[in-house]
Amino acid sequence: MDIKEQIHGLTEEMLTNLGRLVAIDSQLGTPAEGKPFGEGPAKALEEGLKIAQELGFKTVNLDNYCGYAEMGEGDEIVGIAGHLDIVPVGGDWSYDPFKLTREGDYVYGRGTTDDKGPVLEALYAMKLLRDSGVKLNKRVRLIMGCTEETGSKCMEHYNEVAEELSCGFTPDASFPCIHGEKGLLQMMAYSKNTKIISADGGFVFNAVCDSSTIVVPAEEGLKERLEAVLAETKLQEYKVTEENGQISIYAKGVPAHASTPTLGVNAIGVTFECLEKAGFKDDFVEFYNTHIGTSCDGKGIGLKFVDEYGELTLCNGMIKTENDVISCTIDIRVPVTLKSDEVRRMCEGRLEDENGRIEILGIGDALFFPRESPLVNALYKAYTDVTGDTENKPMVIGGGTYAKSLKNIIAFGPEKPGIDYRIHSADEFILVSGMAEAVLVYMEAIKNLLAI
């Protein structure tokens, strides 16, 4: 039986095991004794390691921060790092996000592509390599993390208690290969003076706000003017209601990952833009539209920048009101050639005026491997040898992965170019055919890395 037939024969088993992982709500929870990230991530890690044990692998649980499955012998380690935690569900799902649902080649559920499915693809690639009798001159270790979506503290713990990887990849991005990841700048915007009664929207820092509700004092004719300008927007849905001297504006935009905000429609930004167009005069509305807005390029705070690997992007993910102060999250992906001190210099003097202020929470450096580095070449060759695709080339992305937390690895698959898998959105899915191909690619990748 050739390898493709073997993978085909394992498809139902892979999907059953994926269903076991998808059924676990592994969002970041409340820490408890022995469970630093709460019940869900710990349960997902336990199940992931159990599946690896059932497939015959040695497993280690590193204090419920993360764990790993391993095969082979030797001092050097080829590492694969995936994650079992998920982002909040959010949005309007057509399927139960915690029940694997198959329709033809499509399999729906939260975490199917980000990143529970890819963890299993790598695990089955390891199984098939082991069963084929290939010589393992190094150890091959699949690390299962629990907080990639919320800061990767799991990998901080790994670095403290476990061995450094010689080389490897994280199956948490796109094919053909990711040789760079933009830097991350996180900010908060705050109101100083505002007539807005309440503002609520978004559910995570790193996704475009897909729904919001803004409540403002009623003004004569404002409801009608708002309805007129909202009708001209790209919102999927909106509703303006007036009662008890207040106007409530509900807006439903389009979700997107913070690394690609132009693919979404920011419900908050559109609402604030429409408030201004409708003649609602407010200090924070003016501040927001001037400094944040809907353009996604950072020009409002002096950060518009493009290099040969991509442009700077800005995403407003959440808004809330607390103690009469409105706050907004700002997630900025910084091109790989732009250093953190340059970022601070560019936006200096642009972050505050009489209407509001923006505070820098932190700046994370970019990751970059030269295109011709041995690691990039080894992984890209695995992809092209299996798929025959030489048109798509190694790229730089705005997303951040475990490659920034672990030494000597880069992101590699499994998303195929041109397909929106709806990660961080409703109806996230993975393709069964894509899973089979990814297993093949990861088998080749591991063999190539064993030879470095």
Give the role of each language-model region.
Residues E149, M155-P335:
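Midchain, well-structured core segments that form catalytic/ion-binding scaffolds
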Residues E54, I77-M144, T150, V161-L165, ...:
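Active-site metal-coordination/substrate-binding segment of hydrolases
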Residues D85, L230-Y238, A278-G279, G349-N355, ...:
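A common structural junction motif
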Residues G48, V119-L129, Y158, T271-L275, ...:
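Buried hydrophobic packing segments
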Residues D2-R110, V134-L136, A251:
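Acidic/His- and Gly-rich active-site-bordering loop/insert found
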Residues E103-D105, A125-R141, R225, A278-V285, ...:
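Phosphate-handling active-site elements
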